[in-house]
Amino acid sequence: MGVRPEATPNPNAIKFTTDKMIFEGTNSISVMSGDTSEHEILNDLMKLDGVDNVFGYQNFITVNKHFDVEWDDLVVEVVKIMEEYGY
């Protein structure tokens, strides 16, 4: 089914879910501006213009954008990166 963007109660956050496991185990991973992660997919998402922070857990990644950025192009870029990683 690929990557599925899903709205969240926060208009500045979208949850991107996949049928495949992205992160093993029961720990969540958060990356804030200026941080890096051992998970390259999160680092690549943080490089996108307009991304404020990312949160990953098992089969999803939630991307939080800056309030003044529109989702239109950003959703396409997030899905593209996740698909490049095989999700």
Regions inferred by a protein language model and the residue ranges of each:
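Glycine-rich, charged/polar anion/phosphate-binding loops
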Residues: 1-3
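Short glycine-/aliphatic-rich beta-strand segments at the starts of folded cytosolic domains
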Residues: 8-31
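A generic structural motif
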Residues: 14, 59-65
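Short, surface-exposed beta-strand-loop junctions and turns on beta-sheet-rich folds
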Residues: 22-23, 69-71
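Short amphipathic alpha-helix segments
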Residues: 33-47
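Short acidic amphipathic segments
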Residues: 45-60
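Charge-rich, low-aromatic oligomerization/scaffolding segments with amphipathic character
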Residues: 70-82
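Conserved short beta-strand edge segments in small beta-sheet-based binding/regulatory domains
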Residues: 84-87
